[in-house]
Amino acid sequence: MKIETYEKGIYQIVKVQEDDHTVNNLSELRDLIIGYLKRGKVNIAVSFCDASYIYSGAVSVLINCFQMVGERGGSLCIIEPDPGLFDILETLNISNVIKIYASESSLPQIPE
């Protein structure tokens, strides 16, 4: 797993890239988010780059991260999902819980 991070507006952008285009283990992402929360950074946008599939264990970690961020008064969202991944997130109703934005430029500039 390759993770790239940077700040944009109020968000910490986290780009996660897997070699096989699937999201299966998000323990590194969870640890990174915990570190952000400890430093008071509570608005996090995650991009899974070219991933077109997400395993159920990864969905569970993602929901757990969403809850941790929410408990700190922050926002965790997904940006720029691959169409295949977007379809899976829609089918699982994840998009009803975690906001999904088409691009970084679509991110809110003030906390929601």
Q: Can you describe what each PLM-predicted range is?
A:
Residues K2-D31, F48:
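STAS-typified acidic loop motif
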